[in-house]
C-alpha cells in the first residue's frame, strides 16, 4: 500500500485493522472505520493526531483566537497558541474572575459554531478539576466525538494501541485525556494534539 500524501484518507493503521477484522470496513463520510454489523463508527488517531476532522465544522488556532480569550480579562496574552503555559496563565486569571470561565471555554472550543451548553458543562467540571489545559482537551474530545458521530476512538503509535468508548459526560472525557498524551493546540491546527 503506497501512501501518496502526508495525510492520507486511509492510513496504515486503518488498513491494518480493516484487514484483520472481518466485521470492519472503511466508513464513507464521517469516521474512519465502521463496524459493518452495527454501523458504529470508530475514529482512528495515529501519531501526532489532532482532535479535529477534515470538515468545516472545526476552526483553526491563530493568534487572534488567543487574543480574544485574554481580552475577556482586559489583558494581553503573549501566546500565539494554546499550550500548558498559556493555560496556567488563564488559570491564574480565572481565580480572580471565575464568572468568565464559560466564555473562556466557549472561545476555546475548536468548532466554528461553539455551544454554550457544552461550555457550561465543562465549567462545572473545572470547578472540581481546576486544570484548564486538560479541561479544554476533554472538551475538544467530547465535541469531536459528537461532531464525528463516533462511538469509539482508537489511538495507535508504533508500539501499540488503545480504544475508548465515546465519552458520555465531561468527567468521562477528562479521564480519557488524562490517560493519554495531550499536547498543545498549535497555530494552524484545528484541535489539540493527542496520542498514546
Go through each PLM region and give its residues.
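Acidic-basic catalytic patches of nuclease active cores, encompassing PD-(D/E)XK
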Residues: 1-27
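Low-complexity, compositionally biased segments
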Residues: 17, 35-38, 160
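Intrinsically disordered, compositionally biased, charge-dense segments
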Residues: 24, 41, 161-163, 196
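Catalytic cores of nucleic-acid endonucleases
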Residues: 26, 46-163
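Conserved catalytic cores of phosphodiester-cleaving nucleases, focusing on short active-site segments
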Residues: 33-48
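C-terminal or late-domain output modules
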Residues: 164-196
Amino acid at each position: 500500500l503506497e501512501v501518496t500524501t502526508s495525510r492520507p484518507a486511509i492510513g496504515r493503521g486503518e488498513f491494518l485493522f480493516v484487514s484483520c477484522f472481518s466485521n470492519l470496513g472503511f466508513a464513507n463520510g464521517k469516521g474512519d472505520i465502521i463496524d459493518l454489523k452495527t454501523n458504529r463508527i470508530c475514529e482512528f488517531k495515529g501519531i501526532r493526531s489532532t482532535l479535529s476532522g477534515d470538515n468545516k465544522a472545526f476552526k483553526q488556532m491563530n493568534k487572534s483566537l488567543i487574543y480574544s480569550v485574554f481580552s475577556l480579562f482586559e489583558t494581553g496574552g503573549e501566546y500565539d497558541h494554546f499550550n500548558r503555559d498559556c493555560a496556567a496563565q488563564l488559570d491564574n486569571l480565572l481565580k480572580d474572575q471565575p464568572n468568565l470561565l464559560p466564555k473562556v471555554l466557549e472561545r476555546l472550543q475548536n468548532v466554528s459554531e461553539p455551544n454554550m451548553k457544552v461550555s457550561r458543562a465543562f465549567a462545572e467540571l473545572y470547578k472540581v478539576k481546576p486544570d484548564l489545559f486538560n479541561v479544554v482537551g476533554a472538551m475538544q474530545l467530547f465535541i469531536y466525538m459528537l461532531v464525528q458521530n463516533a462511538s469509539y476512538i482508537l489511538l495507535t503509535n508504533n508500539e501499540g494501541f488503545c480504544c475508548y468508548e465515546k465519552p458520555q459526560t465531561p468527567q468521562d472525557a477528562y479521564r480519557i485525556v488524562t490517560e493519554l498524551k495531550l499536547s498543545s493546540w498549535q497555530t494552524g491546527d484545528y484541535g489539540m494534539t493527542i496520542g498514546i
